[in-house]
């Protein structure tokens, strides 16, 4: 989710008011969201020469570039970045542009088609005459735009026109010949996706088909069948931003007396399933004590395809299996408290740039374009495991997927999530990710959050009263609304929230805190300021006490999530009784802004700045820190003997500051976050993978001068993701490197645990650290500038994410995926592989639904029953399901349904259970080995299991004509298509703790799905014939054991 911080709500509302052509300041072209921007842009279209004069602040370097400058307005009303869009100079270009903005299920010209039902000023729909008028005006504007282009003066050709013409003809012939030759000899998937909508999948499958949800759906059916129309609509639509008391994410955002746990990326670095679940338990417990029903996490999208992606740190790592295991364990932990977890963001939310149009001044969000196989094998894999973990809610993402908005993408929500993966809970939108009314209902969205439509806090919802109207006039089938409501209510019953004990203090069971004020008394509806004042904060401490204190699990996760990357001559662990090599007092230097508390952890809203020690990224995935133990504070009491320490809590130091030190501790970081915040020149996504704030220079300066070249330098990195460290990692002065990721409130304490060896260095990398950003491949680069009116991010090689790409192209990383040193040593031996079932190509036929979904009366009520009750006084900007009048409630022949709406799809053969066909999760192989601690310390080893698929796998392709004798007619046969696989893929892992000389057996299993690939032709998981190679080791490139199956 990405709402603006409450402390800046006024500024953001001011921006919304001014984000309009009629109120732009001279020389600053402002762009409103699509449904406003397109008609106005068309009506005021100017030639390129006019554009050249339009922006008095344009960069002179671009005066003749054929581009004009868009200046996006951010939430604070300031200009942080510019996007250059090519000017359309010919009629064909205009036609192409207009075609592009009218595709994608009628999304991009939604002002004339989609929002006629859902974008009103006074809760009134446009009647049919107004609709016709709007469409007529729009078409007229388009005609006038083309006419102006055709009226441009013709180009005066030079006298050498014939030479130019000849050159053009020759060039075209060469290009055509080359293209045809390439097409014949190189039959592959196209390297760009055409800008066409995603496949359609209708109707939206009904919930209540799985046995373990049966009781919950029965209870829900009993309740829903007695609800009125407006009561049903009320459940599906949020009440509006800041209209309630709370908003929550990873932890409890904007709440008092809650814990700031280590980030997801730190949790993934533990590779410890038990800790993953314990962290989830603690998070769910705090939500329960604060009266929160739904926790908006965990995040498993972004997956980390782009190492510079701004929100990667909220997830658990750049591998679908690691991400899936951590997400599933977190969900089980959260929901063990009766709190609903939310699997987000479904799906392909891999970058922050252009995720929302109003954040970047573009017509609509970018499209993440991905193939069916990569979608299943990489990006949807964690969501499938989350559904197997019984997650109650899934959040759809901001951007488009294959040019259809994720929150109305019927293929994703209906076809994959609800049918194939058997999701029984409800789909909620990310905050303001809903971009249409009817299409989102039919496309599979069940709950609109926070209820606002296209703008924050404007009181206009795409659903609310407009959904009531759409059901009454039959634009939306009432049975679809019934399923939406039933899914939500069934999830409430499924988590036992109907029997919740009311959280302290005794009250109505709702939130006992306000996200919008720290005062005891405050507004009940902050977004309205309607005068409703009450006690809103009861200051309930949810952090636990004594042995149940959540700080304990936070510290454990932070410590086990710390990765030891380098350790020359056992520099670490440090001794608490250390002395100088000369026998005197140890002289310690502490360097870097990242070591200190600076202005405190909550100095910037939503942690939207990089100051002091970095303990979390920024954005809606953060919390208000109850405290933060910085490294410098923890170091003050770290030694048991007297030492001489000097702190330089800045990143600019002189060589002389290090020459007299025996030990130099350098603290550096790299930060990023959600796209609605820009900090330090970073607009959500990182600009590169280097350390920030001069960190690389700081490391080189200290490491080259510590002790005059005789001292030892230890580097501690706090980072949101991979950091390129080539400029200093091999310096002889760099003796040890610790990657502490984002450790949360117990940062300093957890670091001391590892630094001084109280716990083993047992973290392992959840991603690959390359030697440059380019090492990750062209498909892993953030799209920083729009490449089309609707930015297109093509995930052409998404099957080869992270270490898979390095393996594919034999690129040597600095530190591979899964890498991490320990303070002891381990040996893996005695691998044995045992089949548990016979191989078979495909799962058996899809099982029938275990339970029939609820059935309701679909008759419509009297429209008058949906009017505001007599004498009712609405709260300003609060979202209601009631109608203010009966306009547009008569049944109508609605004709703007998305493409494919009238085509019923067949159930997926890969479905039939939670997470997919039950047979996919049957164990096929047992893998056993012995693990021995061969060192002199207790330690933990992460045993990682990888699979290589058989070579030369093929499947039937298209029909092709085969050569035949001259006297015979031609014949056709299916060609065989070669199926490519990554060199190896992670499929299982476990973490084991051993005493010195201890030896223990480890057993892991592989499921059918682990040994299958997604066949785009068969639309099912297929286990290929041939021998699989099964690798076991310590990282993706340290795999001493291999066997075959």
Swiss-Prot record:
Pfam families listed in its UniProt record: Fn3-like, Glyco_hydro_3, Glyco_hydro_3_C
Membrane topology (Cytoplasmic): 1-163
SUPFAM superfamilies on file: (Trans)glycosidases, Beta-D-glucan exohydrolase, C-terminal domain
Principal subcellular localization: membrane
Coiled coil: none
Keywords: Carbohydrate metabolism, Cell membrane, Cellulose degradation, Glycoprotein, Glycosidase, Hydrolase, Membrane, Polysaccharide degradation, Signal-anchor, Transmembrane, Transmembrane helix
InterPro entries cross-referenced by the UniProt entry: Cellulose_deg_GH3 (IPR050288), Fn3-like (IPR026891), Glyco_hydro_3_C (IPR002772), Glyco_hydro_3_C_sf (IPR036881), Glyco_hydro_3_N (IPR001764), Glyco_hydro_3_N_sf (IPR036962), Glycoside_hydrolase_SF (IPR017853), Ig-like_fold (IPR013783)
Topological region Extracellular: 185-1045
Bilayer topology: Single-pass type II membrane protein
E.C. numbers: 3.2.1.21
GO biological process, any: cellulose catabolic process
Superkingdom as given in the UniProt entry: Eukaryota
Membrane-spanning parts: 164-184
Compartments it resides in: Cell membrane
PANTHER family associated with the record: BETA-GLUCOSIDASE, BETA-GLUCOSIDASE E-RELATED
Functional note: Beta-glucosidases are one of a number of cellulolytic enzymes involved in the degradation of cellulosic biomass. Catalyzes the last step releasing glucose from the inhibitory cellobiose.
Family named by the database record: Belongs to the glycosyl hydrolase 3 family.
This protein's name: Probable beta-glucosidase E
Organism of origin: Neosartorya fischeri (strain ATCC 1020 / DSM 3700 / CBS 544.65 / FGSC A1164 / JCM 1740 / NRRL 181 / WB 181)
